A protein has these predicted regions:
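Glycine-rich, aromatic-flanked loop segments that form ligand/cofactor-binding clefts
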Residues: 93-96, 102-137
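Non-catalytic positions within long, well-ordered alpha-helices that form the structural scaffold/packing
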Residues: 148-151, 208
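Metal- or metallocofactor-binding catalytic centers and their adjacent structured scaffolds
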Residues: 5, 37-112
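Structured beta-strand/loop patches that form or line metal/cofactor-binding pockets in enzymes
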Residues: 1-45, 49-53
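Active-site mouth loops of central-metabolism enzymes
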Residues: 127-142, 161-162, 191-197
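Short, well-ordered coil/turn segments that N-cap beta-strands
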Residues: 95, 124-130, 154-156, 181-185, ...
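Catalytic core of soluble alpha/beta enzymes
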Residues: 160-163, 167-232
């Protein structure tokens, strides 16, 4: 079995754009769709999503176009070998481009095996719990109203994108914990990598006491020492 062709598209919906933190403009959401076809007619599909500040992005799709020739004529089931050959070398490769290829190759492997990918990997569940994720809203009352709407739709977990200002975020966290029963709905806070270490620890301790389920991305992703400090 060999890869015969690859198709990649960047698509963007004409929807309202949202802010995720006070220091960011409204974000443009772009989906990059990838399809890998074999000469036997088997197909693997994937999609990755990016947010950018000043326009829709094409760099993920363009990066895949540069990588695609390496994959043509190769065995799609040899994922580790393929990944070694497409690793970043002469020019940087966006992680999203590598992720799209990886997901499509796994999807293709599931189609070859004739079973859903989760089943091929040993999964025993036929459904998973979902959570809703908010944009940044203007004030606490707007968040409380939004949570009410999400509960009416059947959600039992909500992740907050907020102003990413510790005191304002704590004000919201206290308000939702007071207004709603945290034994029946889970809350999570996403700080979008905006906090300093001291603020991260302070906020983490308080929202833990408030019954929040998790605290996402308080520090820059590569601040490994900071995350070690937070998790001691």
């Amino acid at each position: 079995m060999k890869i015969e062709r690859i198709e990649v598209s960047a698509v963007a919906p004409p929807t309202e754009q949202f802010q995720w933190s006070e220091d960011l403009p409204a974000q443009y959401a772009t989906n990059t769709l990838l399809r890998i076809f074999t000469e036997d007619g088997v197909e693997g599909v994937s999609g990755v999503w990016n947010a950018t500040s000043y326009g829709f992005e094409k760099y993920t799709a363009e990066a895949i176009r540069h990588i695609a020739p390496i994959l043509i004529g190769r065995d799609p089931l040899q994922r580790e070998e393929l990944f070694f050959d497409i690793r970043p070398r002469v020019f940087p490769v966006p992680p999203q481009a590598l992720a799209a290829i990886d997901i499509a190759l796994w999807d293709l492997a599931g189609n070859v095996a004739g079973m859903p990918l989760y089943e091929m990997l040993g999964g025993a569940r036929d459904k998973i719990r979902s959570y809703a994720s908010t944009p940044m809203l203007p004030d606490v009352d707007a968040y409380l109203k939004f949570v009410e709407e999400l509960l009416a739709e059947g959600y039992t977990a909500v992740k907050f994108h907020t102003w990413c200002i510790p005191e304002k975020d704590l004000e919201l966290s206290r308000a939702v914990a007071k207004e709603f029963d945290t034994s029946k709905i889970d809350f999570m806070l996403d700080a979008e990598n905006n906090y300093e270490r001291g603020d991260s620890l302070r906020v983490a301790r308080e929202i833990e006491d408030l019954g929040f389920t998790w605290f996402e991305a308080p520090l820059p992703d590569y601040d490994l020492d900071g995350y070690r400090e937070l998790t001691r």
